[in-house]
Curated annotation (Swiss-Prot):
It comes from the Eukaryota. One of its GO terms (biological process) is negative regulation of peptidyl-serine phosphorylation. This is 5'-nucleotidase domain-containing protein 2. Promotes dephosphorylation of tyrosine 3-monooxygenase TH which decreases TH catalytic activity and leads to reduced synthesis of catecholamines including dopamine, noradrenaline and adrenaline. The exact mechanism of activity is unknown but may act as a phosphatase or promote the activity of phosphatases or may inhibit phosphorylation by acting as a barrier to interfere with protein kinase access. It comes from Homo sapiens (Human). The keyword Magnesium applies. One of its GO terms (molecular function) is 5'-nucleotidase activity. The lineage of its organism: Eukaryota, Metazoa, Chordata, Craniata, Vertebrata. Belongs to the 5'(3')-deoxyribonucleotidase family.
Length: 520
């Protein structure tokens, strides 16, 4: 007997499938398994495998067999830094604000909170709002903060003219800097976001009037002073064991590539003396012999676009030489320059070059979009996020979330009072589950890769500007030098033969035309 869409019988089947799912998830949560079935029984088999935090993930197909030349950034690529660096940057910039910019002494009470912000957030300068935006320019509600306090969803929507959407002209441009909104993309921006939020919190808490643009610029300048004055370099040089991580793995990666006949180069914005000390610590005194070209103080990203800056050679003491550069020699150190001269002198072009960096805009965007290099993004946060994804709590929460989504979609067919009541309860529970899942990653902002269901703006850039991404350079040690990376085919919404949430609920109907007759 055929069941008509919207009938009481079909609704009964739907509610029965929910009851079964509730029993399974409750039993799993309580540590028991009805009929010897576990939480993972709710998931398709291919979803149950745990992810490897040391894996390399592909956005685009790439064979290392075709790569002849490997390039690297230095900070957070060759050299991974400990989180202990962030409190130093925060407290020093805070003190600079007080002592040099004459900010209130009361700001000194704030200490760095490593759990507050995540990378990839946007800051609306005129509204003093720190927020997470998805790939479609929508603010994720519940992730907007002014100072250290959350801003109600209603206020966020009102601030943007009755919508969560941020218009394109206001959004960050190609390098993450728009007219009024900036995106914080590098790892060094974590203490900057924390300090900015603390200063705004102090001014608001003490009812002090301030110009949002001036405050933003002062905080940014104070953070910049920490770098420009070389303070951060001094801290690292004084205690490399404390601040530099995985140095032996960096040496292993470089040595392995050279042993297989690959050519290597380094392009970094850091000064030579700092890079030299760090590389000696990680690799040894002969580190320069591993690289065919070394370029320091490159001034990325303008290095990739400005043709006017010539290369300058440094002598063994780090002093500038005056001779014209007609070739780039192995073992020598060069300063500034530009990519166009680099390409002309090396003839390293196109897909046979693979460059690694941590900053999607400054390191990778131009190389991929304008020059056709292959690119690899170093995302240290990936390791922690994958470990969270592998937890039973995450899988339980996400599975039940997806199940509710499928049930909500089907339950819309029924318009009686009882159905509407069930629908409202499910919507409330789904929202609660989304908040729980978000808090597993970060209580304020969630995952750097996802909003509730969409990719973040950060993820959109990651996919656009990188062929590969990984937690650290050492992940290369897990693969042969001729390995081919294949991205998994992710079905578009209209391509999926079965809806994942239907697989989870046991409602195996597919969205074929006959089953969606109520849609006109």
């Amino acid at each position: 007997m055929r069941v008509e869409s919207g009938s009481a019988q079909e609704r009964g089947i739907l509610l029965e499938s929910l009851s079964t799912l509730l029993e399974k998830t409750t039993a799993s949560h309580e540590g028991r398994a009805p009929g010897n079935r576990e939480l993972t029984d709710l998931l398709p088999p291919e979803v149950c495998s745990l992810l490897n935090p040391a894996a390399i993930y592909a956005n685009n197909e790439i064979s290392l067999r075709d790569v002849e030349v490997y390039g690297f950034d230095y900070d957070y690529t060759l050299a991974q830094y400990a989180d202990a660096l962030h409190p130093e940057i925060f407290s020093t910039a805070r003190d600079i604000l007080i002592e040099h910019y004459k900010y209130p002494e009361g700001i000194r009470k704030y200490d760095y909170n490593p759990s507050f912000a995540i990378r990839g957030l946007h800051y609306d300068i005129q509204k003093s709002l720190l927020m997470k935006i998805d790939a479609f320019h929508y603010v994720q509600l519940g992730t907007a903060y002014r100072g250290l306090q959350p801003v109600p969803d209603e206020e966020v929507i009102e601030l943007y003219g009755g919508t969560q959407h941020i218009p394109l002209y206001q959004m960050s441009g190609f390098y993450g800097k728009g007219p009024s909104i900036k995106q914080f993309m590098d790892i060094f921006s974590l203490p900057e976001m924390a300090l900015l939020s603390c200063v705004v919190d102090y001014f608001l808490g003490h009812s002090l009037e301030f110009d949002q643009a001036h405050l933003y610029k002062d905080v940014t300048d104070a953070i910049r002073d920490v770098h420009v004055k070389g303070l951060m370099y001094q801290w690292i040089e004084q205690d490399m064991e404390k601040y530099i991580l995985r140095g032996d793995e960096t040496f292993a990666v470089l040595s392995r590539l050279v042993a297989h006949g690959k050519q290597l180069f380094l392009i970094t914005n850091s000064p030579f003396s700092f890079v030299d000390k760090g590389m000696r610590h990680m690799v040894g005194p002969d580190w320069r012999q591993l690289f065919d070209v070394v370029i320091v103080q490159a001034d990325k990203p303008s290095f990739f676009t400005d043709r006017r800056k010539p290369f300058r050679k440094l002598d063994e003491k780090g002093s500038l030489q005056w001779d014209r550069i007609t070739r780039l020699e192995k073992g020598k150190i060069y300063r500034q320059g530009n990519l166009f001269d680099f390409l002309r002198l090396t003839e390293w072009r196109g897909p046979r070059v693979l460059y690694f960096g941590d900053h999607l805009y400054s390191d990778l965007a131009d190389l991929m979009l304008r020059h056709g290099w292959r690119t690899g993004a170093i995302i240290p946060e990936l390791e922690r996020e994958i470990r969270i994804i592998n937890t039973e709590q995450y899988m339980h929460s996400l599975t039940w979330q997806q199940a509710l989504t499928g049930l909500l979609e089907r339950m819309q067919t029924y318009q009686d009072a009882e159905s509407r009541q069930v629908l409202a309860a499910w919507m409330k529970e789904r929202q609660e589950l989304r908040c729980i899942t978000k808090a597993l990653f970060n209580a304020q902002f969630g995952s750097i890769f996802r909003t509730f269901h969409n990719p973040t703006y950060f993820s959109r850039r990651l996919v656009r500007f990188s062929d590969l991404y990984m937690a650290s350079l050492s992940c290369l040690l897990n693969y042969r030098v001729d390995f081919t990376f294949y991205p998994r085919r992710t079905p578009l919404q209209h391509e999926a033969p079965l809806w994942m949430d239907q697989l989870c609920t046991g409602c195996m109907k597919t969205p074929f035309l006959g089953d969606m007759a109520h849609i006109r």
